[in-house]
């Protein structure tokens, strides 16, 4: 069985350094952070938060999950992410998405929400050039320039990995064209399997070698002693975050249950083709997460190994 890496998302804009050190100490492979300019509640900025985390850690990989790509000037984003990769000694992974579920932030930033897909595609093409080439000229629909070299260049070669997030076919095509990995959210294992088949076909259609393409999955988790409590917390937390009723669908998209339940559910889910990276988001405050995570002994973690697979919550 191929190796699966696990990550955990920052749960708050506060205490970033402390949480990052905890995640690294517990052995997570990735620390991730999402962002919005504005949403239904306080939301971080991934590049700023991960910069703080970079200074507090040494080994854990740092992933934006996601950068809200169409709201950025792509030249500035290329610069900021290159510097973050250098500052973290080559640990940055750029997860990208196009947003659109909160149109007010597009209006506030002066970006037409209907252009978010085309802007993102152009930005990805441009950013890869600026990361890897010198004296770059670019003639796009939204950005034009000539003779630009960004220094320092990223540490990782050929460039920091690009993970494309989304749920629908345009995002799959974007991943197949520009991405190094696929990072959907609110997906079942079956949905992941179907999407990867499409992405592979789209990539081959575009003439890409897809053998190194990495499938991932952003999973919401809720771990409590009582399974019913875990389900209720999951529905309540997601409902608050997304201003929707999750009471009927939390069970479809959330890994919830007791510390004893969840490993078994993971073992079933690991039959899906998730052979590179999984990102988890825990709807627990940092202190509760620390208590739950540290209570799961090293022996219990080792018992979950199947080949190179390690399932953590």
What are these regions (language model features)?
Residues 1-10, 100-104, 143-159, 227-251:
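N-terminal small/glycine-rich loop or linker at the start of catalytic domains
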Residues 1-57, 61, 157-160, 282, ...:
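N-terminal beta1-alpha1-beta2 module of alpha/beta enzyme domains
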Residues 2-11, 70-137, 185-186, 190-194:
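Flexible, glycine-rich active-site loops centered on histidine and acidic residues
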Residues 4-14, 67-74, 159-167, 248-260:
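Active-site mouth loops of central-metabolism enzymes
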Residues 6-8, 31-33, 62-64, 92-96, ...:
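Hydrophobic faces of well-ordered beta-strands that scaffold small-molecule active sites
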Residues 12-23, 80, 166-174, 258-268:
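Short, acidic/polar
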Residues 27, 53, 84, 127, ...:
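Conserved, mostly hydrophobic/aromatic
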Residues 124-127, 192-199, 285-304:
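C-terminal helical cap(s) of enzyme catalytic domains, especially alpha/beta-barrels
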């Amino acid at each position: 069985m191929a190796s699966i890496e696990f990550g955990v998302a920052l749960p708050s804009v506060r205490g970033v350094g402390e949480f990052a050190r905890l995640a690294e100490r517990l052995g997570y492979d990735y620390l991730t952070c999402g962002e919005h300019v504005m949403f239904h509640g306080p939301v971080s900025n991934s590049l700023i938060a991960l910069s703080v985390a970079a200074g507090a850690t040494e080994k854990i990989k740092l992933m934006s999950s996601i950068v809200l790509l169409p709201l950025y000037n792509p030249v500035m984003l290329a610069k900021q992410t290159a510097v973050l990769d250098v500052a973290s000694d080559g640990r940055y992974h750029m997860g990208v998405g196009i947003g659109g579920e909160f149109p007010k932030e597009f209006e506030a930033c002066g970006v037409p929400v209907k252009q978010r897909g085309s802007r993102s595609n152009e930005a990805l093409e441009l950013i890869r050039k600026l990361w890897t080439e010198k004296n770059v000229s670019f003639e796009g629909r939204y950005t034009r320039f000539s003779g630009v070299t960004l220094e320092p260049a990223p540490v990782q070669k050929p460039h920091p990995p690009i993970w494309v997030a989304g749920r629908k076919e345009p995002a799959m095509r974007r991943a197949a064209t520009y991405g190094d990995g696929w990072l959907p959210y609110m997906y079942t294992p079956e949905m992941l399997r179907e999407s990867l088949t499409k992405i592979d076909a789209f990539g081959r259609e575009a003439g890409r070698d897809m053998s190194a393409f990495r499938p991932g999955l952003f999973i919401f988790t809720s771990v409590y002693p009582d399974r019913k409590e875990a389900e209720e917390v999951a529905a309540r937390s997601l409902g608050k975050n997304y201003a929707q009723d999750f009471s009927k669908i939390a069970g479809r998209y959330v890994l919830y249950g007791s510390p004893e339940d969840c490993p078994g559910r993971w073992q079933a889910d690991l039959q899906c083709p998730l052979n590179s990276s999984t990102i988890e988001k825990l709807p627990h405050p940092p202190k509760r997460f620390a208590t739950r995570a540290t209570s799961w002994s090293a022996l219990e973690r080792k018992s979950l190994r199947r080949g190179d697979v390690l399932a953590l919550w």
